[in-house]
Structure formats: structure tokens, C-alpha cells
Amino acid sequence: MRKILFFGLLSICFLFVFFFYKQKENKIIYNKIVEKFEDNVVIDETYTHLFKDSNLKELVFIKSRLIIPELEHKKMMKATGYRADAYRALSTVYKFDFKVHDNKILGFKSVIFEGFEDAKVSKHENNLPSEKWQQLKDFNIGDPNINEKFFHLEFPFVVKNTLCVTISKGFFKKIKKLKRLKIMLISNEDREYKIDIENFLPKYNL
């Protein structure tokens, strides 16, 4: 009788731990912002995954869509020229924001998505508009040395660093097929920040 009771309680504990782990892993904070200016609309959808056990505090996936009615017309979508090309490239933007807390200002020289180690990475500044955005292959991590003159400083407070990684629509479709998101960030100090979470991207209409 005692053995049955013991194994029964043990099973309940395992189920509770598993349920708690799944709840923790699947905790995604969703937010949607719609802004209008004149006849144009900007829609930002964010999906935030929180971490508790490391300096890497948040992974935020952002889908931004710009809707300009006059350029949504079929004829305009087939048009050529800088304005039409830029709109096609930028009408929908996908990006990850990685938020890392430290007592220093950090730069990130490399981002690796497991399974796509040979991805084509660009490192230009996140300035818009730019012809470089139209040439985005897989993803862009920005200039890792843009704050290089501050790297040696240490502060008596928490510095909230944000690495913005913009990904192409084609690369987004590839990582959306993964079962898990396994991503490694490498800082200017060669410190590694690893992510291994359930891939939440297929669950949403993105």
C-alpha cells in the first residue's frame, strides 16, 4: 500500500514538474500596436519570451507591416524604381531583439542560428531607408563596433543592451519550420549567450 502511495505521489510530482516546465517554456507575451498617419498604417506585432537565469533577459520577435494604399495597387506592386522596390522590401519586416543586461556596453560580432550556420549575414547599420535593405539575403546584425569607444567602460548600474537582428522573409520561412529555436550570440568579448526554446513562430499567423 505504501509503495502504491509512494509511486502515485511520485507520478503526480513528475506531472507537476512537466506541466510547470511547459508553462514556463511556452510563456509568450503578445502585443499589437496599430498606428495611422494620413492614409498609411503601421502594424507592429511583438512576441516576447522572458528568461530568468542569465544575463540574456528577453528574446523579442517583431513583425512590422507598413501599408501604403496607393502602393498596394496591383499595378504599383509590379512597378520598378526606388520607391516601388523599397516598399516591396520594407512593407513587411521581421526581426529579433535580444536584450542582454550587463555592467558594460556590449557589441555582438556574431549570431548563429543552429541548422543555418552557412547563412549570409550582413553587418550594416540599421538606418532606413537604405538600398542595402533591398539586398538583405538572410539576416543583418548591425555594426558590431558602433559603440566600440565605450566597450572598456564599466558602470555601477545595469546596462540594458539590445541587439537587433533583422531577417529576410525567405530566412524567416526557413526558421519557422524548425521545432526549436537554437541561437547563439557572441559578444565583442567572446562571451556566448545561448538560446534553446520551443519554436513559437509556427503557432501564430505570421
Curated annotation (Swiss-Prot):
InterPro entries from the UniProt entry = BptA
Quote any Pfam family the record assigns: BPTA
Which superkingdom is the protein from? Bacteria
Q: Which residue ranges traverse the bilayer?
A: none
Task: Report if keyword Signal is assigned.
Answer: yes
Region forming the signal peptide:
1-19
Its cellular-component GO annotations read: cell outer membrane
Q: Does the keyword Signal apply?
A: yes
List localization entries.
Answer: Cell outer membrane
Q: Which UniProt keywords apply?
A: Cell outer membrane, Membrane, Plasmid, Signal, Virulence
Q: What does this protein do?
A: Virulence-associated protein essential for survival of the bacterium within the tick host and therefore within the natural life cycle of the spirochete.
Family, per the entry?
Belongs to the BptA family.
What name does this protein carry? Answer: Protein BptA
Q: What is the lineage of its organism?
A: Bacteria, Pseudomonadati, Spirochaetota, Spirochaetia, Spirochaetales
